Design a protein with these regions (language model features):
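Short helix-loop boundary/capping segments at the starts of domains
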Residues: 39-42, 67
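Solvent-exposed, non-membrane alpha-helical residues enriched in polar/charged side chains
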Residues: 34, 59-63, 124-128
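Short, solvent-exposed alpha-helical surface patches in well-structured domains
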Residues: 31-32, 44-45, 60, 82, ...
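An amphipathic alpha-helix signature
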Residues: 26-34, 38, 55, 59
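A short helix-loop-beta-strand connector motif used in the catalytic cores of GNAT acetyltransferases and
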Residues: 62-74
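Acyl-donor (CoA/ACP) binding surface of acyl/acetyltransferases
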Residues: 1-29, 39, 72, 76-153
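Conserved GNAT-fold acetyl-CoA-binding loop/helix
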Residues: 41-61
């Protein structure tokens, strides 16, 4: 009934050409991270946009996320070892073998540089090859042109 792959919990990074996806740890929860979550431009299309975030609320969220069957990765630029955002694989349905993905590039100076595209490719490779999922769902608000463009790649 459930995939034998549902118990895979990744402790290693997914390696790309320019970015690595690193399983999210508390060390990524910094003041810089909180600044992203306080930036209306960054959170406009995210569920967190209406909440005041603190180190404690984010730590609790990450701990709940990491103790579930969901995956959250920090997107880190390899060359400079810089955390620029996160990508998730969640709401995994093992019976029908699909999941939802979400991405946030929090550091706006890295928007439109292809880092999100590479991160998504790494996540999809992991989802399809390692977890043996068949479908990944991604959505975008009608006025989120960057999200729509990203979803059509």
């Amino acid at each position: 009934m459930c995939s034998e792959n549902k118990n895979i919990k990744l402790n290693k990074s997914l390696k790309g050409n320019r970015v690595d996806l690193i399983p999210f740890k508390e060390e990524f929860i910094t003041e810089k991270y909180l600044d992203w979550l306080s930036d209306i431009e960054v959170t406009k299309y995210l569920d967190v946009s209406n909440y005041d975030q603190t180190i404690d609320t984010i730590t609790n969220y990450i701990n709940r996320f990491n103790n579930s069957e969901n995956y959250i990765f920090a997107i880190v630029i390899k060359e400079i070892n810089n955390h620029i955002g996160n990508i998730t694989l969640q709401n995994i349905n093992w019976v029908h073998k699909f999941a939802t993905e979400g991405i946030m590039i929090g550091d706006k100076k890295y928007w439109k540089d292809g880092y999100g595209t590479e991160a998504r490719s790494l996540l999809l490779e992991f989802a399809f090859n390692d977890l043996k999922l068949n479908r990944i769902v991604s959505s975008a608000f009608v006025d989120n042109l960057a999200g729509i463009k990203s979803n059509t790649k």
